[in-house]
Curated annotation (Swiss-Prot):
Pfam families according to UniProt: Mntp
The organism's taxonomic lineage, starting at the top: Bacteria, Bacillati, Bacillota, Clostridia, Eubacteriales
Its biological purpose: Probably functions as a manganese efflux pump.
Protein's name in the database: Putative manganese efflux pump MntP 1
TM helices/strands, residue ranges: 6-26, 36-56, 64-84, 100-120, 130-150, 158-178
Name of the coding gene: mntP1
PANTHER family: MANGANESE EFFLUX PUMP MNTP-RELATED
Length: 183
């Protein structure tokens, strides 16, 4: 696989993470530390799951491809619903400050990387090249998510978005989840 193809593939699978990180970034209670942890969580899981998928892809490709998309979509929909319900509550702390969310969202936005590993990277026989290709995909996801956090800080300054961030973010996450399930 050429570098340009790998870059476009990495960019494509990073878009879900970008959308989710925007929703996280506009949330009122999110801290800089939490944002950084989410960015690195998303990047790490993009790397790890694409590597894992490539490593065992030829064996399980036929049986597992549809399952990760369904699970990832459902998880993101559930998080979207939780975000909307958080908007109705008077809260002192954001749902995203719960440490388990780093893992849950990191894995759920990276499940497509597992599928890409199964289908696209599984032909790479050299473990070093597979590792480097997966690492490149994780790096691209980290950069894209960093840009999403920066962009969300500007979006958050728009008063109507700031006022309804939980609802907007929740609806966007539900739409992402539905996209993963049906498209």
């Amino acid at each position: 696989m050429e570098v340009q193809e790998l870059f476009l593939l990495a960019l494509a699978i990073s878009l879900d993470a970008f959308g989710v990180i925007l929703c996280i970034g506009i949330n009122k209670g999110i801290t800089l530390k939490s944002s950084i942890i989410f960015v690195f969580s998303f990047g790490f899981f993009q790397f790890f799951l694409s590597f894992l998928g490539g490593y065992i892809g030829t064996i399980f490709n036929k049986y597992i491809v549809p399952i990760p998309t369904i699970v990832g979509g459902l998880i993101i929909i559930i998080v979207g619903i939780l975000m909307i319900t958080e908007g109705f509550k008077e809260k002192e702390e954001s749902i995203f400050l719960n440490k388990i969310m780093y893992l849950i969202l990191g894995v759920s936005v990276s499940i497509d990387a597992l599928v890409i590993g199964f289908t696209t990277l599984s032909y790479i026989n050299n473990l070093f090249y597979l590792f480097m290709s997966s690492l490149f995909m994780g790096l691209i996801a980290t950069i894209i998510c960093s840009l999403g956090i920066i962009l969300s800080k500007y979006i958050k300054k728009i008063s109507i978005i700031s006022s309804y961030a939980d609802y907007i973010g929740g609806i966007i996450l539900i739409l992402f989840g539905l996209k993963m399930l049906f498209f």
